[in-house]
């Protein structure tokens, strides 16, 4: 069967369902596809098809995730749904599923539960920009006051984790009733998608961000100078642009790009996603190395101290068999290189077990170009023992 072409006519947004186990995340995902399928904007996926999430391995970590796609009048969506709580933790921290926004599903019959809180915290840790709430199972609650109470509790919880709890759209509905075709509840799904369309912001495209290219290799072309190669992570760069070489050294160096090539062909401009070689003016081979980045001057700084949220691999995932303690000194792998760093655990945390999710403070032995949101792997003896994301940079 020939593959269909992906038509890029609408903005693309990545979202996912989050919330406590059995509050109806997967049923809601199925209901969204059913309601939109009736408008010709999705392919209906039944609960069972989504629930049998295929097992994926992302950086050695086993994750079960279901990917569903659909569109509204305004946008094209890729939607992720995970069957188990551990899958969410791994998925969000390792960045296997980037979310531009999330639908938090809360059962009106139960109110917020422990994982409701954990998933809101996770969304905060990994920088999910916006959340819309779907109060599910409203057909089981006759008492208007009870619904208001649940809504109030969830809004307070969102405020606690620095989401604008008072502004977030709340949609009341029943995913199961919508699947059964009950018009009142089908309308609630339509309202939910309108809220997602309007409240979750369209992400800025990588091409529009400031230029950044991690350096993978450095070599000299006789008579021309030093060339660095790598894949452009974001932004654009033209011949003649000023760039800064950041990381690993005390001083960042500014230089000019005097030539760009891709697939052995010369070009004037490169952009996010391109694998390129950049010729740098007046830079000797020994002044630049793998692990540094080429960036728009002033757009990123080198740091040795940062805080991060990490997921620690289990031994089944190839991680450690034993816990680690305060002062643990593994390697931190950022973009293209490993740097040794020391881990400081939060107050009151004695040790970290395989399978845990924890916030850590790190001090690296060399400065690296880091910023909030950057993902990293924690490695020991060449194998990954944890996967994480920078939550804050200090100095």
From Swiss-Prot:
It is an enzyme of class 3 (hydrolase). It is found in: Cytoplasm. Monomer. Residues 19-26 are annotated as: G1. Residues 10-204 form the tr-type G domain. It holds the Pfam family GTP_EFTU_D2. Mg(2+) binds at residue 26. Belongs to the TRAFAC class translation factor GTPase superfamily. Classic translation factor GTPase family. EF-Tu/EF-1A subfamily. The keyword ATP-binding does not apply. SUPFAM superfamilies: EF-Tu/eEF-1alpha/eIF2-gamma C-terminal domain, P-loop containing nucleoside triphosphate hydrolases, Translation proteins. This is Elongation factor Tu. It catalyses: GTP + H2O = GDP + phosphate + H(+). Residues 60-64 are annotated as: G2. GO terms for molecular function: GTP binding; GTPase activity; translation elongation factor activity. It comes from the Bacteria. PROSITE patterns: G_TR_1 (PS00301), G_TR_2 (PS51722). Keywords: Cytoplasm, Elongation factor, GTP-binding, Hydrolase, Magnesium, Metal-binding, Nucleotide-binding, Protein biosynthesis. Its EC number is 3.6.5.3. Residues 174-176 are annotated as: G5. GO terms for cellular component: cytosol. Residues 136-139 are annotated as: G4. GTP binds at residues 19-26, 81-85, 136-139. GTP hydrolase that promotes the GTP-dependent binding of aminoacyl-tRNA to the A-site of ribosomes during protein biosynthesis.
């Amino acid at each position: 069967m020939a593959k269909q072409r992906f038509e890029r006519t609408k903005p693309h947004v990545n979202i996912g369902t989050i919330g406590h186990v059995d509050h109806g995340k997967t049923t809601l995902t199925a209901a969204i596809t059913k309601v939109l399928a009736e408008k010709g904007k999705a392919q209906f996926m039944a609960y069972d098809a989504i629930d049998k999430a295929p097992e994926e391995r992302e950086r050695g970590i086993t994750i079960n995730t279901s990917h569903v796609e659909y569109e509204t009048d305004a946008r094209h969506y890729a939607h992720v749904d995970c069957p188990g709580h551990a899958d969410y933790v791994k998925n969000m921290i390792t960045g296997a599923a980037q979310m531009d926004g999330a639908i938090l599903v809360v059962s009106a019959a139960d109110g917020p539960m422990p994982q409701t809180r954990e998933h809101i915290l996770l969304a905060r840790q990994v920088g999910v920009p916006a959340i819309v709430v779907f109060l599910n199972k409203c057909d089981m609650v006759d008492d208007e006051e009870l619904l208001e109470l649940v809504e109030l509790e969830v809004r307070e919880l969102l405020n606690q984790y620095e989401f604008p709890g008072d502004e977030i759209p709340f949609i009341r509905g029943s995913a199961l009733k919508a699947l059964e075709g009950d018009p009142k509840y089908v309308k609630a799904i339509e309202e939910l998608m309108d809220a997602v369309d309007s409240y979750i912001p369209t992400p800025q495209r990588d091409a529009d961000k400031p230029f950044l290219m991690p350096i993978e290799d450095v070599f000299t072309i006789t008579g021309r100078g030093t060339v660095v190669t790598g894949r452009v992570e974001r932004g654009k760069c033209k011949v003649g642009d000023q760039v800064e070489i950041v990381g690993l050294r005390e001083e960042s160096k500014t230089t000019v790009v005097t030539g760009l090539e891709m697939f052995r062909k010369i070009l004037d401009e490169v952009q996010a996603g391109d694998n390129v070689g950049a010729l740098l003016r007046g830079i000797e081979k020994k002044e630049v190395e793998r692990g540094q980045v080429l960036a728009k001057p002033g757009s990123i700084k080198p740091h040795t101290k940062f805080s991060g949220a990490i997921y620690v691999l289990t031994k089944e995932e190839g991680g450690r068999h034993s816990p680690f303690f305060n002062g643990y000194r593994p390697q931190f792998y950022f973009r293209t290189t490993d740097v040794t760093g020391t881990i400081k655990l939060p107050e009151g945390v004695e040790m970290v077990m395989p399978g845990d999710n924890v916030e850590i403070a790190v001090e690296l032995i060399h400065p690296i170009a880091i910023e909030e949101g950057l993902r990293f792997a924690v490695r020991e003896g060449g194998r990954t023992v944890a996967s994480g994301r920078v939550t804050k940079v200090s100095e």
